[in-house]
Amino acid sequence: MSVTLAIDAMGGDHGVVVTVPAACDFLEKHSDVKIILVGDPDLIKQVLDKSPKAPIERIQIIAASEVVLMDDPIEIALRRKKDSSMRVAIVQVKEGAADAVVSSGNTGALMAISRYILKTLDGVDRPAIATAIPNELGLGTTMLDLGANADCEPMHLVQFAQMANVMVQVVDGKPNPSIGLLNIGEEVIKGNEVVKQTSELLRQTNLNFYGNVEGNDIFKGTTDIVVCDGFVGNVVLKASEGLAKMMSGLIRKEFNRSLFTKLMAVCAMVPLLRVRKRVDHRRYNGAVLLGLRGCVIKSHGSADRFAFGFALERAYEASKNHMVERIAAAFVVETTE
């Protein structure tokens, strides 16, 4: 089957400078893909003109006169900017013109507009944001929620686990992913009441529930999926990103300390590059907004051309393998049992 991806070409810190070249790269890799670029036609065409190998016959441009800025309040993005590139791109999914939408724009606005236009799936109380975090196994641990829901009830967390279970099966090809519940300890007696009740509910499902996991388990790859509320998830995500940047800076600083350490850096270059590749956050770019009646992928706002390509890849795999339909079917089965 062919896959059509709608791209908010104006979103993120870099806009068309990143989104359009990344789209062209992706089209060269996948002959079964068509792309809809939404935004300022003049700016989009200027970048396309610099990409002579771009398969123009598989690119459609749709004009949008407004842009959702990274610091725009949700109310302005949702109610006032009705011709924004983000909104028009999401509408393409709503109308069936595209199978998925990818945006590097404002996360809060993307969730709000997507929820308003696409609505949530039957049986899903709240959408959640899920993404993969690098682990020592080199496979990535899928974690959710990452900020959409600061406060959650036990049933919300169970639904997050159910949606992530399908997503990992579809996108990562793991037939029976293991699921961990983030807690302050592995013991069932630990945690607040929400976590304790969630643990009990998850044990009653047919999911491959491992049990409670701690923060270090995320990076060890103890489970394929880690579930938590959006407040905790966002703190973990930002803390891990900050730690990675700090360690990278410290290593660079130490190797530049003297001529001897610079020579050591040359000797250690190969293993260092291997480690860098395994923990490169760009390779894990592309958070999925789960629970909506359409596939929405959130790329990091600062994503470069290389990273944005991975967000497109995630949208492609999710669409090609009917992720949204399979999540919907899972909730139909759940409600009838």
Swiss-Prot record:
Record GO biological process: fatty acid biosynthetic process; phospholipid biosynthetic process
Name of one Pfam family that matches: FA_synthesis
Enzyme category, top tier: transferase
Catalytic activity: a fatty acyl-[ACP] + phosphate = an acyl phosphate + holo-[ACP]
Gene Ontology terms, MF aspect: phosphate:acyl-[acyl carrier protein] acyltransferase activity
Keywords associated with the record: Cytoplasm, Lipid biosynthesis, Lipid metabolism, Phospholipid biosynthesis, Phospholipid metabolism, Transferase
Pathway as given in its UniProt record: Lipid metabolism; phospholipid metabolism
Main location: cytoplasm
Disulfide bonds: none
The keyword Lipid metabolism belongs to this UniProt entry's keyword annotation: yes
Subcellular location as annotated: Cytoplasm
Domain of life where this protein originates: Bacteria
Any single GO CC term annotated in Swiss-Prot or TrEMBL for this entry: cytoplasm
Family label: Belongs to the PlsX family.
Quaternary structure note: Homodimer. Probably interacts with PlsY.
Protein function: Catalyzes the reversible formation of acyl-phosphate (acyl-PO(4)) from acyl-[acyl-carrier-protein] (acyl-ACP). This enzyme utilizes acyl-ACP as fatty acyl donor, but not acyl-CoA.
Stated name of the protein: Phosphate acyltransferase
Species of origin: Polynucleobacter asymbioticus (strain DSM 18221 / CIP 109841 / QLW-P1DMWA-1)
